[in-house]
Structures are given as C-alpha cells and as structure tokens.
Amino acid sequence: MGKSDYPVRELVAKIERGELQLPEMQRKYVWTSTKVRDLLDSLYREYPSGVILAWQPAATVETRAFAVATNSEPVTAPLLLLDGQQRLTSLSAVLRGEPVTVKNRKRPVEILFNLDHPDELTFITEVAEDNESHEDADDADDVDSDLITRVNRRAFVVASNQVAALPNWVKVTDVFKKSDSELLKAAGVTGFDDPNYERYSARLKQLRSIADYSYRVDILEPSKSYEEVTEIFVRVNSLGAKLRSSDLALAQITAKWNGSLALFNAYQAEVAKRGFDLDLGVHLKVLIALITGQSRFLTVASLTQQALEAGWKRTKRAMDFAVNFAQQNVGVDSPTLLSSPFLMIATAYWGAQMDYKISDKDAAAFRKWFLLANAKGRYSRGSTETLLDQDLAALRSEGRIGGLNQRLVQQVGRLDFTAADLVGRTARSGAFKTLFLAFRADGAKDWATNLLISPKLAGHADKIEFHHVFPKAYMKKARPDIDGRDVDDIANLAFISSKTNKDISDKAPADYAPKYSKEQLAKQLVVFDDTNALPEGFEKFVIQRRELIAARLNEFLAIAESR
C-alpha cells in the first residue's frame, strides 16, 4: 500500500479536475453544515483530521458523481476515494464556493468566520443523533442579545442573515476568494494603524492555511480486485459506524453487480416523481426481503448477481404496487404522512406474496391494518427490523393479515385511542400523521386561502405546515410557566399554509381566530369559547381538544374498511 501526503488545496484541485473520483460503492454526500463548521474549526486549530483512503484500480470501474461540480472531461487512471468523501467534498465546496447537491437540490455550504473571536476558543463538540436530519439549522436562527454573545465566542458558525450582518463575521469562502484589503475594509478596519489590523490579518492568514493542511493518503495497489476493495471499504466504515447498514449493503451489491447503482437511482427518482421520495435503503430492503424472506442486510454477501438481478425486477413491481396502494387505497399520498417508511416494505411484500391478486375483503383488511400500524407507530418504537421481519414471516406463512393484527395488538395493547394516550404526542407521532388524514377526509382547508390541506400544494406560500394554535412565541410571553413540550402537544397543533402561519405569527388565539371561518377551525377541532382562547385557558383548551382528537381518530380508523 502506497502512502503520500497531499495538501487540502491539491486534493480539492484533484476533485475539480476529475483526477479523484468516487467508486460506485460510495454513499451520497450526507454531511450537514454543522459538521462542515466543526471540520473547519478543527483544521483552524490545527487538530488532526484523520487519513484519506484511495485506490488506484488497474481497470476502469463504475463511478458516481461528487456532490460538487467537477470537470466532465474523461481522465486517464483517476484515483478512487474510499474514505474521506465527506471531508473532501465539504472542503471543496467551501474553498471553491461551489454548492453541494443533496436530494437532487443544490444548496450552498455557507460558514461564517469570526475575525474577533476570543484567543481562547469555545469548544463546540456536539453528540450526533443516529437519525440526524439532513436539514441544516442556523447557529442563530432566533437572534437575541444573549445568543449573539454566545455566538461571538466561536470562531465558526453556520451562516445566518443576522450574524452575517455583523462586521466581524466573514464568509469562509470569501477568505479564499478575496484579498485582505477587501475583507478588512468590510470589517471596519480603516488602515494599518487600526488596532485590529494585525490581529485580523493574522487570523485571515491562519484560516487560509487550512488549504495547506496535509492529509496522509493511503493508496491501495492496482492488484486488488473490486471485490476485495469493497470488503476493505465495508470494514473501514463499519469500524467507526460511519455508514448505515444500507450503505454497506449497497457497496456489497455494486461489487457483485457492476452498474446496478444507476438502475437503483433511476427507479428511486421515478418513484419520487410519483410523490414517494423514499431513501434508497427502503427499496434495497424490499429487494432483500423478496429474495430472502427477511429484511436484514446480513445475507447480502451470499447473494449472487443473478439472484440480485431477478430480485430487482420483482422489487420494482412490488414497489409500484405499494405506492399505488398507499396513494389510491389508503389515501397516503406522501411519505411525510407515514410514521415509518417500513410500512411500504410490508405493503410491497404483501402484494408480491398475494401475486397481486387481491380481493375486496383482503384489500380492505390490509388498508385497515396499514392505518392502524401507522397511527400506533408499529415501526417507530424501537427494534424496527425485528418487528418488520415478524410481519414478513406472518405474511409468508399465513398469506393473509390476521397475523399482522395479532402482532400489532401484542405490541400496543389497544387499537383505539384515549385522550390519555395522546398526552405528549407531537408532530412526529403516527397519531398526528393520522390526524392529518382524518382532517383531510373531513374537508379541512387552510384558514385563509380555503385550499384543501395537502402535502402536495405547489409554492412555498401554500405549503402546509403544522401550526401551534397557541403560538410558541406567544406562550413564552403570556404563559412562561407552561413547559415547551406541552405547547408542542398534538392537542395544540393544526394544519395551515406557510403564509397563514406567518401571518398569525405570535398573535393570541383570541386576536387571530375571529378573522377565520369558525367552520374551518372546527374542521380541525379548534373550538374556542369565552375562556379557552385566553392564555389562562390553555390547559382547558388542550384537554377539551385532546378528547375530540381521540374520538375523531377512533372514528376515522373504525371506518377504514368501508372506504
């Protein structure tokens, strides 16, 4: 194995020129801007930043695109990047000022640097959650004086308009594209005799030195086969738990079936256009389930290319059925209305087991199970793969859904809802997603535009959001004694458009409610009287509405068979 040292600027240039590429086995770019912020902070402090692993293949292999723009001209004998994609893509985006492509959307990676940071920098290490969202949060979304004080203790933050407007903060990308004189002038430095001139200049020099940081690059020799390199890739990434099991499975599949990634991505995009933008891992789980009868990726290494190719044909048919059934039979026209995408796996498997010959009775029974499993969070309570495999086994051995209902009852106890069951349920719960379905069935509309609520409304202004009936900002002022979790309770949430939500802002219910139709408010069980619209009536309102919600959920789920 060869070893070389490359400065960041040269690695970034290699990506831009196409001399450093990604093999098909690699996953997509997944870093959030906060991770990029932390990488820059580490390099600025001259902390070690790991090793880069690459491979010099002897023959041409399938590749996938970087998330940043690269030279489209063919390159002879490029290096293939095995470990370090997230770091180098991030650095390429920041140093070159290029956006990254995430979920088919381009977004800039904007990090701000504090010219006036304290000499003793604040540590910003954070614990990442396993289910961390790909959406970025600004370091100062809601800026107040205390927050600005905390932010000013840092050297780097994710960009926000409020912080960017402060003279001591500059875009990191600008530091690599503009001269000191431009940056210092914008920061209010008037000349060489300015007390901040030397300090700010030294910090700009230190920040630019990130481009000179040297990574050790270990290069696997050309004699290694694609299969062996894939095994190395899986082992390297498994040790640090950097990749999800679906990412590792994808690497093993593409090693056996070259060119399969393009087929997977094309079908994933096709399904997304139909309204179901599902993670590729969901499609791969259906593939494995149809071949092996269970959903875990542990068996991928033993599957042949022939089995994978035949299984993929069955997978596309099964997923087509699952999407059609969810949209047309259940009324779930977006994955945002699912408590777990695993419901689509169970549906696809059921359709295949039935050979797509389904009676009215079976369709109604499965629809009811689907709605109940979604509402009760069948696959969102932990041990999800175990529960899914139990359901696949039930469908395989019994052919009908009696086993599914039995296992659901064993898990949750009761299939109905009481008001007590809803205490503490939030917008992430299956009950809340089911409530949307129930309200839509009742003809609920946006309170201002009179458009039917739907996850598919076009345009940002009409996009449906969940709204706090007693707005959070209002409650902070009017009832600071109320815990924020109580304000986020399902009994205080409704569905309105983004524009209507912004218009209401932090107004009291007693002030904004008279502007809207009582009938439309009532369609979402928002019923005010002389007392419960006042701040002191918050508890009364949520208790009353929680009872109404429980009754409506039970009614909606009970009539599922007759749809």
What are these regions (language model features)?
Residues 486-518:
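Short Cys/His-centered divalent metal-binding micro-motifs
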Residues 457-492:
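Histidine-centered nuclease catalytic patch
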Residues 249, 272-420:
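A cross-family structural signal marking well-folded subdomains
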Residues 2-288, 292, 366-373, 377-378, ...:
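Basic- and aromatic-enriched surface patches that contact anionic nucleotides/nucleic acids
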Residues 19-26, 205-222, 227-231, 267-270, ...:
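Short amphipathic alpha-helical segments and their helix-coil junctions
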Residues 186-206, 294-321, 463-466, 470:
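An acidic intrinsically disordered interaction segment
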Residues 375-466, 474:
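Intrinsically disordered, low-complexity N-proximal targeting/linker segments that flank membranes
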Residues 40, 92, 230-233, 344-352, ...:
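Short, amphipathic alpha-helical segments that act as regulatory/interfacial helices
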